[in-house]
Curated annotation (Swiss-Prot):
Keyword annotations: Amino-acid biosynthesis, Cytoplasm, One-carbon metabolism, Pyridoxal phosphate, Transferase
Annotated organism of origin: Bacillus cereus (strain Q1)
SUPFAM superfamilies per UniProt: PLP-dependent transferases (SSF53383)
GO molecular function, one term: pyridoxal phosphate binding
Organism domain of life: Bacteria
The protein, known as: Serine hydroxymethyltransferase
Broad EC category: transferase
Quaternary context: Homodimer.
Length: 413
């Protein structure tokens, strides 16, 4: 970044500081990952200069012959990975992908069944502070009070009672496998559309390690980062019968020109997901998550649902007599990055919370394995149990530094 360093020292310094943070801390935020240098090169390419409103072969600007190739590559690779009939890779985010689906099939005020945010859902699944909860009549389903798993009989009962036009499956903080086939059966029984938001598990689905929602859902949305390990962005997969409507909802419906440099980075990441070693990577994510969950439980920590089937773990910190906010802060102080998170049947404010959400996608990309998961479990428990003991926190910092120093990253940057 020699040009940036010479031209804008302040921005360069901030980027360098962030690189230092990523190198020196243990990244456990479940929605984050580390992309390859190839993905970063594509996103930082000259494609950032190109406007390309429309779709390949049907643009509103000239000079799009090369970006058309890039977008076609991205779409074709997604079809190959997930078996989708139609793909739109233009959404700037998962939220905009969800918005486009809603705009395609819903009218303002229509009833939708979605997962309660504190039970593991997402803001765009009907939260009253989000456009989805403002524009549509969302009815919530959740998890069982004891098992903390989705109660499909309850979902069916609510679907029969409220007759939603759309059912939304998928989550942002649910550590268990979701039965998409069952969701489709419920949707069919009440004559509803089914949309699956697989943002968190897309990489696991791509590797064949989590059930694929594409054969069951009318629409599948996802981000392109998280476990899929691409750039930050979104996409929509749908049945061919909805292709024209979905494309129209994205452009000109809710977006203008697509970000072609990001789509190029998406294409590169999708190519990586098609390689044999990506399945090994995804399996390691799951193995690491299971080992980390076991280690946390051995340390006496409480896990929502008692464990995990994917990359994500939700820790209930109430038995430690602290809040999620305190836990996030003290872990960050020693070099472990997490996020506070609500838990099912939450009683605390979303700005405080009773839980912490962690995930293993990023540390697995860095090369951490089972032994490192044991050390991380020990570190988390040690830090939280000694959150007011500065000597203990200093010891934890040294242990974090010793661990991260064994796994250098982005050494060419």
């Amino acid at each position: 970044m020699d040009h940036l360093k010479r031209q804008d020292e302040k921005v360069f310094a901030a980027i360098e500081a962030e690189l230092g943070r990523q190198r020196s801390k243990i990244e456990l935020i479940a929605s984050e990952n580390f992309v390859s240098e190839a993905v970063m090169e594509a996103q930082g390419s000259v494609l950032t200069n190109k406007y390309a409103e429309g779709y390949p072969g049907k643009r509103y600007y000239g000079g799009c012959e090369h970006v058309d190739v890039v977008e076609d590559i991205a779409r074709d690779r997604v079809k190959e990975i997930f078996g989708a009939e139609h793909v739109n890779v233009q959404p700037h985010s998962g939220a905009q992908a969800n918005m486009a689906v809603y705009f395609t099939i819903l009218e303002q005020g229509d009833t939708v069944l979605g997962m309660n945010l504190s039970h593991g859902g997402h803001l765009t699944h009907g939260s009253p502070v989000n456009f989805s909860g403002v524009q549509y009549n969302f009815v919530e389903y959740g998890v069982d009070a004891e098992s903390h798993r989705i109660n499909y009989d309850d979902v069916l009962a609510k679907a029969k009672e409220h007759k939603p036009k759309l059912i939304v499956a998928g989550a942002s903080a649910y550590p268990r496998v979701i039965d998409f086939k069952r969701f489709r059966e419920i949707a069919d029984e009440v004559g509803a559309y089914l949309m699956v938001d697989m943002a968190h598990i897309a990489g696991l689905v791509a590797a064949g390690l989590h059930p694929n929602p594409v054969p069951h859902a009318h629409f599948v949305t996802t981000t392109t980062h998280k476990t899929l390990r691409g750039p930050r962005g979104g996409m929509i997969l749908c049945e061919e019968q909805f292709a024209k409507q979905i494309d129209k909802s994205i452009f000109p419906g809710i977006q203008g020109g697509p970000l072609m440099h990001v789509i190029a980075a998406k294409a590169v990441a999708f190519g990586e997901a098609l390689q044999d070693d990506f399945k090994t990577y995804a399996q390691n994510i799951i193995n690491n998550a299971n080992r980390l969950a076991e280690g946390l439980q051995k340390e006496g920590l409480t896990l929502v649902s008692g464990g995990t089937d994917n990359h994500l773990i939700l820790i209930d910190v109430r038995n430690l007599e602290i809040t999620g906010k305190v836990a996030e802060h003290v872990l960050d102080e020693v070099g472990i990055t997490v996020n506070k998170n609500t838990i099912p049947f939450e009683t605390a404010s979303p700005f405080v919370t009773s839980g912490v959400r962690i995930g293993t996608a990023a540390v697995t990309s860095r090369g951490f394995g089972l032994e490192e998961m044991d050390e991380i479990a020990s570190l988390i428990a040690y830090t939280l149990k000694n959150h007011e003991n500065e000597a203990a926190l200093e010891e934890a910092r040294k242990r974090v530094e010793a661990l991260t120093s064994k796994f250098p990253m982005y050494t060419d940057l």
